[in-house]
C-alpha cells in the first residue's frame, strides 16, 4: 500500500514538473504588444534635479548600474559614478544577470531606445524587442508618472558612456 502511494506521489511530481517545464518553454520568448505609458522626458532643470535625487537615492539605480564593487561603494558614499552597468549578479539556478548601461549612449546605453520603450521597460518589465525581462528588482510599476519622467530625464542628461555589457544568461 505504501509503495502504491509513493508511486502515485512520484507520478504527480513528475507530471507537475513536466507541466511547469512546458509552461515556461511555451512562454519564455513570448512577445508582448503592450504600449508604454504616453510620457515624454523633460529638459527642465527641476525635473532633472528630481531625477538625480531619485536615481542616487530612493530608486537605488546607483546601487547596481555601475561597473563594479568599487563604484558601488563610491556611489553609496555620495560620489558621482557613471551608470554604465556591467555588474553581474549570480541568480543561483536561474542563471546570471548583468546590469544594463543607463547612460544615453546610442551604441550600448539607453540612447538607442525611445522614451516609450524605456518607460515600458520600467513600468511593465517589457524589453524594447517585446520580450519580458528578468523581473525588476525595484517596484517601478508603482512609481508616479512624474517620477518616471524625472528618472529618465536625468538619465538622458548624463554624458554617454560607450560600455557594452553582457546579456543575461539563463540556465
Where are these regions (language model features)?
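The canonical Cys-X-X-Cys-His
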Residues: 51, 58-68, 118, 151, ...
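Electrostatic cytochrome c docking/interface patches
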Residues: 32-56
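Aromatic/His-enriched, Gly/Pro-containing loop or helix-boundary segments
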Residues: 36-43, 107-110, 115-117
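Acidic/histidine-rich, surface-exposed loop or edge segments in extracytoplasmic proteins
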Residues: 95-104
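Flexible coil segments in periplasmic/lumen-exposed cytochrome c-class electron-transfer proteins
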Residues: 26-38, 67-96, 128-171
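N-terminal type II signal-anchor transmembrane helix
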Residues: 1-31
